[in-house]
Amino acid sequence: MYQLFRHGIFQMDAEKAHNFTIQCLKLAGNPLFQPILKSLIHAPKGFPKTVMGVNFPNPIGLAAGADKNGDAIDGFGALGFGFLELGTVTPVAQDGNAKPRQFRLIEAEGIINRNGFNNNGIDYLIENVKNARYKGVIGINIGKNKFTSLEQGKDDYIFCLNKAYNYAGYITVNISSPNTPDLRQLQYGDYFDDLLRSIKDRQAILANQYNKYVPIAVKIAPDLTESELVQIADTLVRHKMDGVIATNTTISRDTVTGMKNAEQQGGLSGKPLQHKSTEIIKRLHQELKGQIPIIGSGGIDGLQNAQEKIEAGAELLQVYSGLIYHGPKLVKELVKNIK
């Protein structure tokens, strides 16, 4: 059935297809229709897992970028995910980069996007989270507005942290999108140190205010040198971050040279990212020595490479591009088998 749906949406521009899918899932998540979707999916229960102090119904999640504004929480939830990471969301709404900005690399099962954090703003997202009936864990992925300078960047993250804290199972700090100018600079040196220090200080204040501890993860890029990775791992440990998501999209085109759309600017996700993200997980795991849990993301399209990420050191997994190419059966297969 999904193959038929995929054939239809693949006739559309990639972003239009994405928006159409979100609307379908929003409708499917409606209390009137959700039982129908659930009966079609027959989502297995999966294996509960406690990571970052949070109880996840199962270790399979939706990666950020799929439901940026939380418009289809209950629809995605009905597919069987143990957790959904919403966003990336910024303090105020922004349009993102010029269209077209999403491109399929069908033969490689990849996607290139240069969206640029297009979203309706944190307040819109929080309203959707408040109204959702989904029983799994909701993660909220936060970023900075394009017009905010690097020097002021931490203010945007603190603003979003304040808004999201009481409504999130965990929060992700996204400093690794390649589509906001200079954003990845926040992964390095004094910027990184200062950002994490500010975030941890604010987390302590909010934990006291709300009388609950909401863990904070950092999402990193796959395009890191060995020394950069070591430095990032050291900084994460030093600031006692609660989790790390490895990885975001890649700016490398090594795996797709010569393919249609490979020349497009932006971050590459899907199968071409598979090996690279797993290698980063493996190295990160060696550096972190079990002190900080890793959430693995990047190119998961089946049980084998999902298992590879677990063996490399990931405790939870996230999918997005694989869902586009393989449909809900991918989620079902992973939930049923990954512990």
Curated annotation (Swiss-Prot):
It holds the Pfam family DHO_dh. Binds 1 FMN per subunit. The lineage of its organism: Bacteria, Pseudomonadati, Pseudomonadota, Gammaproteobacteria, Pasteurellales. Its main location: membrane. It is a peripheral membrane protein. It is found in: Cell membrane. Monomer. Its cofactor is FMN. Its EC number is 1.3.5.2. Substrate binds at residues 68, 113-117, 174, 179, 248-249. It comes from Haemophilus influenzae (strain ATCC 51907 / DSM 11121 / KW20 / Rd). This is Dihydroorotate dehydrogenase (quinone). Pathway: Pyrimidine metabolism; UMP biosynthesis via de novo pathway; orotate from (S)-dihydroorotate (quinone route): step 1/1. FMN binds at residues 64-68, 88, 141, 174, 219, 247, 270, 299, 320-321. One of its GO terms (molecular function) is dihydroorotate dehydrogenase activity. GO terms for cellular component: cytoplasm; plasma membrane. It is an enzyme of class 1 (oxidoreductase). Belongs to the dihydroorotate dehydrogenase family. Type 2 subfamily. Keywords: Cell membrane, Flavoprotein, FMN, Membrane, Oxidoreductase, Pyrimidine biosynthesis. GO terms for biological process: 'de novo' pyrimidine nucleobase biosynthetic process; 'de novo' UMP biosynthetic process; pyrimidine ribonucleotide biosynthetic process. InterPro entries: Aldolase_TIM, DHO_dehydrogenase, Dihydroorotate_DH_1_2, Dihydroorotate_DH_2, Dihydroorotate_DH_cat, Dihydroorotate_DH_CS. Catalyzes the conversion of dihydroorotate to orotate with quinone as electron acceptor. The active site is at residue 177. The gene is pyrD. It catalyses: (S)-dihydroorotate + a quinone = orotate + a quinol.
